[in-house]
Amino acid sequence: MHRRQFMTAAALAAASLTASTAFSAESADAVVKAYVEAWNAHDSAKAASYFAEKVVYYDASVGKPIEGREAAKAGVIDNFLNAVPDAVWKVKGEPIVQGDRVAFEWEFSGTNTGKWADGTAATGKKFSFAGASVFDTKDGKIASQSDYYDALGFFKQLGLM
């Protein structure tokens, strides 16, 4: 009798853990997908709403993380959407989802018709470059985002190098 109760409890615990992991992965993927959709709708407020209050955004080409939702919104989302009002962020292939972590390759393209936050004037040039991003989510929000891409190629396309 005790063995049957133990086996039932063990089976329920395993099912609960599996369901929890699956839900977590689906939630992480859904949050990141909605975030990318907000970028492509050029809605910086909505995109930033997917960030945790204390999000850490890391751009490998810059080398220094930006911390906090408002700082990431201003320094990344607003910066790019103001400088590239026709920006398109295209996910290539299916994202890799593992628990609360999501990673995917992408292509970012558009025309630089606006001024960059650092004061660099618009070049009027079209560009397209590839990269990859890794996201960590927590409680339905993006806790961290790390972007890796060919910054030199991007700057050359803009005529800045």
Where do the model's predicted regions map?
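Short, flexible active-site loop motifs that bind/organize anionic cofactors or intermediates
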Residues: 34-37, 62, 144
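Residue-level signal for alpha-helical context at structural boundaries
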Residues: 46, 53, 64-66, 73, ...
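Short, low-complexity N-terminal intrinsically disordered segments enriched in polar/charged residues
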Residues: 2-53, 161
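A short gly/proline-enriched turn/hairpin at secondary-structure junctions
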Residues: 50, 56-67, 80-84
